[in-house]
Amino acid sequence: MLDPKLIKEKPQIIRDMLKARKVDFDLDTLIECDQIRREFIIKTDELRKKKNHVALEISEKKKKGEDASSILSKMKNTSVELAKLEVEQEDIENTYTKLALTIPNLVHESVPIGADEDANKEIKKWGSIPVFDFKINDHIDISENLDLVDLERAAKVAGARFYYLKNDLVRLNQALISYGLDFLSKKEYSLIQPPYMINRESMEGAVIADDFEEVIYKIEDEDLYMIGTSEHAMAAMRSKEIIEGKDLPLRYAGVSPCFRKEAGAHGRDQKGIFRVHQFDKIEQFVFSRPEDSWKEHERMLAITEEFYQSLEIPYRVMLLSTGDMGKVSAKTYDIEAWMAGQSAYREIVSCSNCLDYQARRLKIRFRDKTNEDTQYLHTLNSTLIATTRILVSIMENFQTNDGHIRIPSVLQNYMGNQKEI
């Protein structure tokens, strides 16, 4: 949600943002609703003052033993008028809020303008793309040859794009999680294992719900959704709270399974474990002072890069364009890892600064002194690891000529010093 004052006083900034994002949004209706809403606030405040004044008059009359019947009639009329206005005000407030919750976030000036991923900007590359002197396989063939994944039985049990991890791939998956949590613990993150379901109010605080409903699973007959990422649960964790300024930044590392419909996956992604309905993920989430959020954004990206460098996985960093980034983010970096079996870089990380957009929706504020005015803080999020995608990268990039998989050195201690699968 954007600052209503900004929408009212500088609507051209909002129009420019909508144009850059190529989003069709009825800003004029929102502005009109805001104006009507403000007029109702003035009218209801005036009537409440009038009602209070009449109540005092009645009290004075009764104290003096005088007849207050005419004033009581006046009070009744005022109360009826106020009740009617409050109903109308609630209606316009609901209309305004519903619209305001769907407007996208502002866009940072460094974000490239463009319709889609073709306008994304490559920021850097790291690592050498592996060169093989033998015919390589993709992760689907590798996992089948080594009995590491069972897709056929998973499809029988749960449907397409589910999987059974098996044998040493289970251990490698757990090694990635354990290493990732240890890695972030050393970077001043507090570890969080959130609820795997959230209610609609929490979801609407973190995302534009109508957009995200197509992605996540709804629990039938319950006000609950399976989480698509722990980001949403961590964002809502501090909803309606005032945080002490001295405690900022708050850095959380959330570990959880994630559940997504992943509609629209095509080609080879329909097979294997790269794009699936369920996966384990470690997510970074930060509550920051507004003046520090861009520094925190770069810090988060640097930490995530360091993690993949330690895994020896070649990657590139992309700055997403206005047409490719999410509506909640003001600026997003993606990290794409090299997948040797596909001869391509594929997305593994999304790292975003959401400014005060989520904090306004979730009513999360901070202050430095007890009697000081509160401010909305900034929220940031970044994937550290979605394990199935990194399992794909490791299987393809670390395959050997005798059909095995070399285990990255930093993970070997987590697998009893095992060096290959």
Predicted feature locations:
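N-terminal alpha-helical targeting/anchoring segments
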Residues: M1-I129, E144, L148
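TRNA-recognition modules of translation machinery and tRNA-sensing kinases, especially anticodon-binding
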Residues: K125-I421
